[in-house]
């Protein structure tokens, strides 16, 4: 066994902090305009009605209302916000 670590092993053992991605408001929840609904990398979930898409693919509410997740196409998902009647 080596009695010195060697160059490779001393450079490993680092990791980055988690990015706190995921769904922040679930289906059926009430949101206000500007609330973040999903933080994601790429458009895993696509924007539907009354939601905006940020430059980092964050989906956020444009109006006050209720969140609804919907399927469209064969294998895509979208999220919309509908006003409360």
Curated annotation (Swiss-Prot):
GO terms for biological process: translation. GO terms for molecular function: structural constituent of ribosome. Pfam families: Ribosomal_L27. SUPFAM superfamilies: Ribosomal L27 protein-like (SSF110324). GO terms for cellular component: cytosolic large ribosomal subunit. InterPro entries: Ribosomal_bL27, Ribosomal_bL27_CS. The keyword Ribonucleoprotein applies. Residues 1-21 are annotated as: Disordered. Keywords: Ribonucleoprotein, Ribosomal protein. Belongs to the bacterial ribosomal protein bL27 family. This is Large ribosomal subunit protein bL27. The gene is rpmA.
